[in-house]
Design a protein with these regions (language model features):
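Soluble non-cytosolic domains of exported or imported proteins
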Residues: 2, 16-27, 142-146, 150, ...
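N-terminal capping segment at the start of a domain
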Residues: 1-25, 30-32, 36, 50-56, ...
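Extracytoplasmic/secreted proteins, especially bacterial periplasmic and envelope-associated proteins
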Residues: 3-6, 24, 28, 179-182, ...
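Active-site-adjacent substrate-binding region
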Residues: 44, 194-195, 202-293
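A structural signal for isolated positions on well-ordered beta-strands in alpha/beta enzyme cores
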Residues: 41, 81, 166-168
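Acidic/histidine-rich catalytic neighborhood of metal-dependent amide-processing enzymes
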Residues: 90-93, 107-108, 118-221, 232-242
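Short beta-strand element of the alpha/beta-hydrolase
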Residues: 78-85
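A non-catalytic alpha/beta surface segment that caps or lines the substrate-entry region
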Residues: 7, 13-73, 93-109, 121
C-alpha cells in the first residue's frame, strides 16, 4: 500500500523542466505507474516557451508520460484521462502578485481613455510587476503541482484494474503549456473520444473550482461531486486550455484560496504547509464518479 505522504515528499522538490530533480521526479512517476500495471510511453518534445516569461531558454525540451493499463484483450483506449503537470517553477513574485499586475495592466489601458496621469501611474506599477515575471528553480511546487500528482494515484488506487482510465503526466506546463501543446499536436487521436480531467494545485484550504473548457457529462458530474464552483474563464494558464480542442470534454479542477495564490511559485510552496487533505477529497470525489461509469 502506498504511503502518500512519503510519495508527496519525494515529488515536492524544485523540479524546473530540464534539471536533475525534474528527471528524478519523472522516474518516480514511471515507477509508481508501472507498479500499478500501467504501460508508460514517453513522448519527447521541444517547443518555445511563452513570450511573457523572462529568463527562459529559446527552446524547451521535455517528456510527457502517457500511461495506459495493460490488457490481454482487444485494445480499447481510455474513456477518461486524468492529467497533471509534473514540472515546477519558482518566480520572484507569487501568482497573487502576478494577477494584481495583470488586472493593473487592464485597468491602466482602460483608464487611458478617461484620465491620462492616473492611467500612466497604474501602468507603471503594472510594468514593474510584469518585469519580475522571471523563471527560477527555487520553489518545491508542493501545491503546484505535487498535490495533483498524488491525487491521481489516490484516485486510480480506488478504481478497479479494469477501469478505462488513462493517465497523462504532462511536462513544461510552467513554460507556457509546452507539453500540452505537443500532446494536442502529436497525440490528439488518444483523446478524441474521451473525457479529460486536468488537476492543478489542490490545496487543503479553499473550495474546489471547475474551470470548464469543454462541457460534458463526466466533467459536470465531477464538479457536482466536489461541490465545485464552475467557471468558463479564469485568469490562469492550465493544460486544459491547450488540450480541450482535441477531446470530447475537458475540465480543470483546482482547489485553494487567496493564501494559496500567495505561495504558488514561491519557496513557501513546500510540504510543510500541506496535509494532502485537499488532494484526498478531490480524489475521493473523482473516484466516486469514475466507479459509476
Amino acid at each position: 500500500m502506498t504511503d502518500y505522504a512519503v510519495l508527496f515528499r519525494e515529488l515536492a522538490i524544485p523540479r524546473l523542466a530540464g534539471t536533475p530533480n525534474h528527471q528524478k521526479v519523472r522516474e518516480i512517476l514511471k515507477r509508481e505507474l508501472m507498479a500499478r500495471g500501467f504501460s508508460v510511453e514517453q513522448q519527447a518534445f521541444r517547443g518555445r516557451p511563452a513570450r511573457a516569461l523572462l529568463g527562459t531558454p529559446r527552446v524547451v525540451a521535455g517528456t510527457n508520460l502517457i500511461a495506459q493499463r495493460l490488457s490481454g484483450g482487444p485494445t480499447v483506449g481510455p474513456s477518461v484521462w486524468l492529467v497533471a503537470h509534473y514540472d515546477s517553477k519558482g518566480q520572484p513574485i507569487s501568482m497573487a502578485v502576478r494577477l494584481v499586475g495583470f488586472f493593473a495592466l487592464l485597468l491602466g489601458f482602460v483608464t487611458l481613455f478617461v484620465a491620462l496621469l492616473p492611467a500612466l501611474a497604474i501602468l507603471a506599477v503594472a510594468f514593474v510587476i510584469v518585469s519580475q515575471n522571471r523563471v527560477t528553480d527555487n520553489s518545491p511546487g508542493a501545491v503546484d503541482n505535487a498535490t495533483a500528482l498524488v491525487a491521481i494515484f489516490m484516485t486510480i488506487d480506488q478504481l478497479s484494474s479494469g477501469a478505462r482510465v488513462g493517465v497523462v503526466f504532462s511536462d513544461a506546463e510552467e513554460f507556457g503549456l509546452v507539453g500540452a501543446r505537443s500532446l494536442a499536436a502529436e497525440r490528439s487521436s488518444l483523446f478524441a473520444a474521451a473525457a479529460l480531467i486536468n488537476l492543478d494545485s489542490l490545496d487543503d484550504t479553499g473550495r474546489s473550482t471547475a474551470f470548464v473548457h469543454r462541457r460534458g457529462r463526466i466533467g459536470g458530474a465531477v464538479a457536482d461531486a466536489l461541490k465545485a464552483r464552475q467557471w468558463r474563464w479564469l485568469p490562469v494558464i492550465v493544460d486544459g486550455i491547450a488540450l480541450s480542442a482535441v477531446c470530447r470534454e475537458c475540465v480543470t479542477i483546482l482547489k485553494g484560496d487567496w493564501q494559496t495564490m500567495r505561495i504558488i511559485h514561491r519557496p513557501a510552496d513546500s510540504v510543510a504547509r500541506v496535509r494532502l487533505d485537499g488532494a484526498a477529497s478531490v480524489a475521493a470525489g473523482l473516484a466516486r464518479v469514475l466507479r459509476a461509469e
